Amino acid sequence: MAFITNSQGGSKNETKGGPGALVLLPFTFVGRTVIDWVDNLGAATIFLFTALTKTFGRKQLFKIVEQIYYIGAKSITIIMLVSLFTGMVLGLQSYHALVKFGAQGALGSLVSLSLIMELGPVLTAIMITARAGSAITAEIGIQRISEQIDALHTMRINPLRYLVSPKIIAAIISFPLLTAVFDLVGIIGGYISGVVLLGVNAGVYLHSIQAYVDLRDIINGFIKVIVFAVIVSTVCCYQGYFAHMRKDSHGAQAVGLATTSAVVLSCVLILVSDYVVTSLLI
């Protein structure tokens, strides 16, 4: 029942919907959610391709290098720390599983393949999302709500070229480099755990890596992380760029919610795309 005031100043009770409306409510919610999701997907895709077309320019190289330092170089410490202990834990768990079958000689290949094909790309992307992706969203979001982006329009400076495209290109360059660091340090962590602490023969560990890891595995890992780089950079830039258009909040609160949405959505899409890309590469 809804309370409605008529044109003569009185009021009346009017029944809106009924049992049929209650039945249709779940379908309405699902339909609206799907439509909003498809709309945002299309808008983000257009946003990505528009930003990429604005990449080339004389002044862009400096900004790309600046973003590579911000996204890549400043993330290397946390990447090395996480990868070292990931490799050590993986080596420890794998050793105790393999020793039951007398196959501890395969420890090197198991650790290296797990890192190169799965854990390296995925964990690298998630860690960069947490450290740099959230900061990118907050930075662009603050520039939006403080009308700095509007000022760029006034000065006839394209905001996508100035703010967005350097970040996307820098992410595409930085993610594979950091993944290579993650893989290498993780394999060293597995060596420390398996060889130094558990007594696996060092030659057997290294020979196992050489025998079972080939170039195709490495390339597949880099393909994955490039896909992750495009997803993370696009989502984080898009959420920040359109933070002022959020329906659930405005101002500083909108920036905070946009940052949270960017990190959560990026992590979910990393895992979803990991399955999709893996199924295509196998």
Language model segments and positions:
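Active-site cofactor/substrate anionic-group-binding motifs, chiefly glycine-
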Residues: 67, 71-123
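Selective transmembrane-helix segments that form parts of the transport pathway or gating/packing helices
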Residues: 72, 76, 80, 119, ...
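Hydrophobic alpha-helical transmembrane segments that constitute the membrane-spanning cores
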Residues: 82-85, 125, 165-194, 235, ...
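Membrane-interfacial helix-loop-helix connectors in multipass membrane proteins
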Residues: 93-116, 185-226, 230, 234-254, ...
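Hydrophobic alpha-helical transmembrane segments of multi-pass membrane transport proteins
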Residues: 107-150
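Short cytoplasmic-facing helical segments at TM-TM junctions of multi-pass membrane proteins
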Residues: 140-165, 251-255
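Final/C-terminal transmembrane alpha-helix of multipass membrane proteins
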Residues: 255, 260-277
